[in-house]
Swiss-Prot record:
Organism name: Homo sapiens
Pfam families xref list: Reticulon
Listed Polar residues bias regions: 199-230
Protein name per its UniProtKB record: Reticulon-2
SS bond list: none
Function: Inhibits amyloid precursor protein processing, probably by blocking BACE1 activity. Enhances trafficking of the glutamate transporter SLC1A1/EAAC1 from the endoplasmic reticulum to the cell surface. Plays a role in the translocation of SLC2A4/GLUT4 from intracellular membranes to the cell membrane which facilitates the uptake of glucose into the cell.
Disease link: Spastic paraplegia 12, autosomal dominant: A form of spastic paraplegia, a neurodegenerative disorder characterized by a slow, gradual, progressive weakness and spasticity of the lower limbs. Rate of progression and the severity of symptoms are quite variable. Initial symptoms may include difficulty with balance, weakness and stiffness in the legs, muscle spasms, and dragging the toes when walking. In some forms of the disorder, bladder symptoms (such as incontinence) may appear, or the weakness and stiffness may spread to other parts of the body. Neuronopathy, distal hereditary motor, autosomal recessive 11, with spasticity: A form of distal hereditary motor neuronopathy, a heterogeneous group of neuromuscular diseases caused by selective degeneration of motor neurons in the anterior horn of the spinal cord, without sensory deficit in the posterior horn. HMNR11 is an autosomal recessive form characterized by slowly progressive muscle weakness in the distal upper and lower limbs, lower limb spasticity and hyperreflexia, with onset in the first decade of life.
Main location: endoplasmic reticulum
Entry-linked PROSITE patterns: RETICULON
Length: 545
């Protein structure tokens, strides 16, 4: 029992208020500053069977004795503000004070779980029997249990400044309160054990911008520690009722941002079943009701709270679909000159714009007929003179209107003159690449045919030129060109109007040609099997059609 005195000397450092209770003289000395030492000795003699002097002298119990006495003494105000009250400078631990100690010291020591724990092996307060991996969690549970006991002892409405009984007289009325407090602590411990198998990274407290480190001086405005506050179970039940319906289905990838009263942004990342939701609600309730958590950052790591900065916004990928519509209808600049020209030629051949297609068709036919009867030099000179006569006439007409003060004399072709015909570097590179690729492709094909890289292809080309010799004897080149222009402006339009019939006739012609090819190959030695296979394939295609 010789180690009891340092405990009380250590607890003497807590701030105390003047007590209106008359001093107890039973078992104490009038000149002593520790007037309740006799009471503490009697208390420890009664419980000598349950605890030993070794349990009283451990560093962990000394720490909890100091915290418990500090929290109970300051019951006149808020517990969070009392816990942050600075220690007086220049005073030793064992220096006595002039003020009277609180008469509820025995009751306070009774309410400390660490001082009345059982020496049974396997109890969570015994650090020797707990595995090394579970000791941080056991320390956390002991602190949470102790804080729950202090909160209930503070909220029971018994102020030490108005108490008029000695610790021995208050010992019997406090028995029901101790039972209720013990049951509440066991229930909180059970809920924390249920939430233990979840992932440790459930909550991520983020400091709000401008808050910096956790501000310990910011009190919680929602709950007062000196009021008659009930147990913490209603708050936990409300949290469980709120998340109760979500226990039936797993939650994937949800992020809930909530800002608590201390300007922390708590972001629970829930990637599992409803057990993690339960753990989230429990930890939020404990954090809001136990302000020491804001003063102990290591506890955040122990229960899965990790300080982290704001998450950078996810970049959004935006794709511009420039060719969602046709270039002509949407007015978007063409990606390549060939695609733009191809669309315009298709519009002309399908007569989408009747006026434009008619003008182009008429101009081409007149030019070709002129070339048919005259030389190309004379035709080009006459066309150039006709164009110049038209433009010069319009220009002179505008000048005459300006001379008679009826016009501004502007060039009628100024809009065309303002058109920018220069090519950008990208367009020049694109055009040069297209021209180069086409020239190289043409040269490769000519080499393939004329240097007999493939004998069959070279024979086909020879047959084509042989047929053209007969065509050239009958038709002129300009005549063939005129027929080609007429076919380009008429065949696509007719095919669109009579597509079904044309497809049927084209299929019949294709089948006949395939039969003819098969007969020719059958007469060539060594190609009989190939000819029969080709004939079978062509026959099956004809039947299917």
């Amino acid at each position: 029992m010789g180690q009891v005195l340092p405990v009380f000397a250590h607890c003497k450092e807590a701030p105390s208020t003047a007590s209106s209770t008359p001093d107890s003289t039973e078992g104490g000395n009038d000149d002593s500053d520790f007037r309740e030492l006799h009471t503490a000795r009697e208390f420890s003699e009664e419980d000598e069977e349950e605890t030993t002097s070794q349990d009283w002298g451990t560093p962990r119990e000394l720490t909890f004795s100091y915290i418990a006495f500090d929290g109970v003494v300051g019951s006149g105000g808020r517990r969070d503000s009392t816990a942050r009250r600075p220690r007086p400078q220049g005073r030793s631990v064992s220096e006595p004070r002039d003020q009277h100690p609180q008469p509820s010291l025995g009751d306070s020591l009774e309410s400390i779980p660490s001082l009345s724990q059982s020496p049974e092996p396997g109890r969570r307060g015994d650090p020797d029997t707990a595995p090394p991996s579970e000791r941080p969690l056991e320390d956390l549970r002991l602190r949470l249990d102790h804080l729950g006991w202090v909160a209930r002892g503070t909220g029971s409405g018994e102020d030490s400044s108005t108490s008029s009984s000695t610790p021995l007289e208050d010992e019997e009325p406090q028995e029901p309160n101790r039972l209720e407090t013990g049951e509440a602590g066991e229930e909180l411990d059970l809920r924390l054990r249920l939430a233990q198998p979840s992932s440790p990274e459930v909550l991520t407290p983020q400091l709000s911008p401008g808050s910096g480190t956790p501000q310990a001086g910011t009190p919680s405005p929602s709950r007062s520690r000196d009021s008659n506050s009930g147990p913490e179970e209603p708050l936990l039940e409300e949290e469980e009722k709120q998340w109760g319906p979500l226990e039936r289905e797993p939650v994937r990838g949800q992020c809930l941002d909530s800002t608590d009263q201390l300007e922390f942004t708590v972001e629970p990342r829930l990637l599992g079943t409803a057990m993690e939701w339960l753990k989230t609600s429990l930890l939020l309730a404990v954090y809001k009701t136990v302000p020491i958590l804001e003063l102990s950052p290591p506890l955040w790591t122990a229960i899965g709270w990790v300080q982290r900065g704001p998450t950078p916004p996810t970049p959004v990928l935006r794709v511009l679909l420039k060719w969602a519509k046709s270039p002509r209808s949407s007015g978007v600049p063409s990606l390549s000159l060939g695609a733009d020209m191809g669309s315009k030629v298709a519009d002309l051949l399908y007569w989408k714009d009747t006026r434009t297609s008619g003008v182009v068709f008429t101009g081409l036919m007149v030019s070709l007929l002129c070339l048919l009867h005259f030389s190309i030099v004379s035709v080009a000179a006459h066309l150039a003179l006709l164009l110049l006569c038209g433009t010069i006439s319009l220009r002179v007409y505008r000048k005459v209107l300006q001379a008679v003060h009826r016009g501004d004399g502007a060039n009628p072709f100024q809009a065309y003159l303002d058109v920018d015909l220069t090519l950008t570097r990208e367009q020049t590179e694109r055009l040069s690449h297209q021209i180069t690729s086409r020239v190289v492709s043409a040269a490769t094909q000519l080499r393939h045919f004329f240097l007999v890289e493939d004998l069959v292809d070279s024979l086909k080309l020879a047959l084509l030129f042989y047929i053209l010799t007969f065509v050239g004897a009958i038709f002129n080149g300009l005549t063939l060109l005129i027929l080609g222009v007429i076919g380009l402006f008429t065949i696509p339009l007719l095919y669109r109007q009579h597509q079904a019939q044309i497809d049927q006739y084209v299929g019949l012609v294709t089948n006949q040609l395939s039969h003819i090819k098969a007969k020719i190959r059958a007469k060539i030695p060594g190609t009989g099997a190939l000819a029969s296979a080709a004939a079978a394939v062509s026959g099956s295609k004809a039947k299917a059609e």
